[in-house]
From Swiss-Prot:
It comes from the Eukaryota. This is Ethylene-responsive transcription factor ESR1. Residues 1-55 are annotated as: Disordered. Belongs to the AP2/ERF transcription factor family. ERF subfamily. Induction: By cytokinins. Keywords: Activator, Auxin signaling pathway, Cytokinin signaling pathway, DNA-binding, Ethylene signaling pathway, Nucleus, Transcription, Transcription regulation. The gene is ESR1. GO terms for biological process: auxin-activated signaling pathway; cotyledon development; cytokinin-activated signaling pathway; embryonic pattern specification; ethylene-activated signaling pathway; plant organ morphogenesis; response to cytokinin; specification of plant organ axis polarity. Regulates gene expression patterns in meristems and thus modulates organ development. Required for correct embryo patterning and cotyledon organogenesis. Modulates auxin signaling pathway in early embryos. Involved in the cytokinin signaling pathway that promotes shoot regeneration. Acts as a transcriptional activator. Binds to the GCC-box pathogenesis-related promoter element. May be involved in the regulation of gene expression by stress factors and by components of stress signal transduction pathways. Expressed in shoot apical and floral meristems, and in organ primordia. Transient expression during shoot regeneration. Residues 56-113 bind DNA. GO terms for molecular function: DNA-binding transcription factor activity; transcription cis-regulatory region binding. 'Dornroeschen' means 'Sleeping beauty' in German. The keyword Membrane does not apply.
Amino acid sequence: MEKALRNFTESTHSPDPNPLTKFFTEPTASPVSRNRKLSSKDTTVTIAGAGSSTTRYRGVRRRPWGRYAAEIRDPMSKERRWLGTFDTAEQAACAYDSAARAFRGAKARTNFTYPTAVIMPEPRFSFSNKKSSPSARCPLPSLPLDSSTQNFYGAPAAQRIYNTQSIFLRDASCSSRKTTPYNNSFNGSSSSYSASKTACVSYSENENNESFFPEESSDTGLLQEVVQEFLKKNRGVPPSPPTPPPVTSHHDNSGYFSNLTIYSENMVQETKETLSSKLDRYGNFQANDDGVRAVADGGLSLGSNEWGYQEMLMYGTQLGCTCRRSWG
């Protein structure tokens, strides 16, 4: 039926009176080609006034109502893919070329010649001038990196690490300036550099617009709240009494009992001088001027210096303190 409609269209077609207008005709089939199936891939376009020059378009077929259909055979499934209907044959040919290049790439057979475009690969990491400017403001140690590493990443590794860490360490580094020693292990020498972290981080934040986190004061946070609550509770509690010093022996010359021992030795020395000066011819001595006397056999009177010293020795013995010097 389609063949009959095509023959009817050809018989009723009249030439355009305007010689500058294009008109399209189907190619006449030769006696040899009549036996084979008609191909729907090619369409002959004849331009009036241009002689006998003809143009064939692959994958374009003219409809009886004057429009042009484009289709292509899928190389994988061997099926025809419908591309659409167009007003002109050139539009249908362009649609076929696009589909052919999508299926077969550079090996596709197209109706028109297309220039081979050289596609430049985009860099893996592209840094603008604003992002690379903080390195000029903040001096960093120059590391001897390989040239292939710089070409692949587009920037030195030290700069990328610094830009990444400056986002998370902004609040911690804004209140201090540190001088960090840097050991150059490649050249065998040691050097130091001083960089202001406050200026670097603030400049990088303003230029790169990397304010991902809200700015907070340095005295905020969970730890600060815990410390404040702890201080509030301790304000109403009275201070605990100081711990007593540990009990030490006479051999230890520190603490309370060492002072007691020194005082005891001085008191024994004074007592000896007093006794030696007041011994009488009977072997008795007068301890004080208040009339209280003591016998040399060891008996002591209440209120004398000897009694106070003996009481002190007894108190020291109960606490574990021993004296090296004996009585008398």
